[in-house]
């Protein structure tokens, strides 16, 4: 058995999980609703406020899908209950972020400001000029939106300038030593 897959998923009060015969999982909660189609070979059952994921055989593909399916459903349950967020920091002289309506506008040293429209289900917050918070209920979309923002200025290893995740550690390099 998969160590991840064999654990049942506890469904908190106020959250409903429904599974159709063709393995479409719908999770509704206080923050919204998520729908995802799971692989047809994996069996998903909802019993006594728990979601139980089982696999038909011990084939390598089924073992992999077992843990994956359980993790995806667990992420959906957490998302509609608590939501997800990623915090990005802008490090560099003149690097700033601000909101214009729902749109995120950043000055990153280019000749033009970088404007990013939020994808559906994602919101941006800027508590400080050098901090951006990406929030949403879908873990995959939150991570993708944060990665799209980060790719505009990846952190460089000499001074650490760029856009980095809050707890990310940038591996630093020493500069040239020069002639003596």
UniProtKB/Swiss-Prot annotation:
GO MF terms held by the record: rRNA binding; structural constituent of ribosome
Example GO BP: cytoplasmic translation
Pfam families (UniProt xref): Ribosomal_L6
CC per GO annotation: cytosolic large ribosomal subunit
PROSITE patterns noted in UniProt: RIBOSOMAL_L6_1
Subunit and partners: Part of the 50S ribosomal subunit.
Family statement: Belongs to the universal ribosomal protein uL6 family.
Job of this protein: This protein binds to the 23S rRNA, and is important in its secondary structure. It is located near the subunit interface in the base of the L7/L12 stalk, and near the tRNA binding site of the peptidyltransferase center.
HAMAP family named in the record: Ribosomal_uL6_B
PANTHER family: 60S/50S RIBOSOMAL PROTEIN L6/L9, LARGE RIBOSOMAL SUBUNIT PROTEIN UL6M
Protein's name in the database: Large ribosomal subunit protein uL6
Organism: Clostridium botulinum (strain Eklund 17B / Type B)
């Amino acid at each position: 058995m998969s160590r991840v897959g064999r654990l049942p998923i506890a469904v908190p009060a106020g959250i409903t999980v429904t599974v159709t015969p063709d393995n479409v999982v719908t999770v509704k909660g206080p923050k919204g609703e998520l729908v995802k189609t799971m692989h047809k070979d994996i069996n998903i059952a909802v019993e006594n406020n728990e979601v139980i994921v089982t696999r038909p055989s011990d084939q390598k593909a089924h073992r992999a899908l077992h843990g994956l399916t359980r993790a995806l459903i667990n992420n959906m349950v957490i998302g509609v209950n608590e939501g997800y967020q990623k915090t990005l920091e802008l490090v560099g002289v003149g690097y700033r972020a601000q909101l214009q309506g729902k749109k995120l506008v950043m000055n990153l040293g280019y000749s033009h400001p970088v404007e990013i429209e939020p994808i559906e289900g994602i919101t941006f917050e800027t508590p400080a000029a050098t901090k951006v918070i990406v929030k949403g209920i879908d873990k995959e979309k939150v991570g993708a939106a944060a990665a799209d923002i980060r790719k505009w200025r990846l952190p460089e290893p000499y001074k650490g300038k760029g856009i980095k995740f809050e707890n990310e550690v940038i591996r630093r390099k020493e500069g040239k030593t020069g002639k003596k």
